[in-house]
A protein has these predicted regions:
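Catalytic glycan-binding domains that act on GlcNAc-containing polysaccharides
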Residues: 1-186
């Protein structure tokens, strides 16, 4: 399982990036209830800023036992599609649904689980490394290169006039008491 605070770190990073001119207090006041998280546009979609090609890769990794991101037979059917459906269209509808964020959260969790699986296969445990997982979530599968000294980074995000990297923002959130009553540390 993915610690909900770690998963949320990636989503909050996307939200801060989208609302980069807002202060932390503004973000907390408007988005804390998690009822009106922004649906991002242009190249990434939904509350989690998912790219359609990343979602397609997550799906492929679920069913490809040769993939370094494969989670095992027990996870192959975690994402299903209606028979004879256009999977691309269904995926897009799922990650852009503003009334139901289930698939956005599911895909973020699956992405992180797949990254963790890749690193575990290489002998490294990053399952509790919020900043590293958020960095890799921000950068994408092709930047995930397991090593003994992973670095927090990613896109720059301005918060209250201060610049953070995407991963550093997630790490700061994870270690803070922000939303701790709703998302306690596991």
């Amino acid at each position: 399982d993915i610690d909900p605070r770690i998963l949320l770190g990636g989503i909050i990073g996307e939200q801060f990036r989208f609302f980069s001119n807002y202060s932390r207090e503004t973000f907390k006041n408007y988005f804390e209830p998690l009822k009106i998280l922004a649906s991002l546009s242009k190249f990434s979609y939904g509350i989690a800023g998912l790219k359609p090609e990343t979602v397609a890769d997550i799906d492929k990794n679920l069913t490809n036992p040769d993939s370094v991101f494969y989670l095992g037979k027990q996870m192959e059917q975690v994402i299903t599609y209606p028979e004879n459906s256009d999977r691309t269209a269904v995926r897009f509808a799922r990650i852009t649904d503003t009334k139901d964020s289930y698939y956005s959260y599911l895909y973020v969790g699956l992405y992180m689980k797949q990254i963790i699986a890749q690193w575990e296969r290489a002998g490294y445990d990053i399952s509790d490394r919020a900043g590293i997982l958020a960095t890799l979530y921000n950068l994408g599968f092709h930047y995930s290169k397991p090593n003994a000294n992973p670095q927090i980074g990613g896109a720059p995000v301005m918060v209250g006039g201060k610049q953070y990297s995407f991963g550093a923002l997630a790490e700061a959130f994870y270690n803070s008491d922000e939303l701790i009553d709703i998302f306690p540390k596991q």
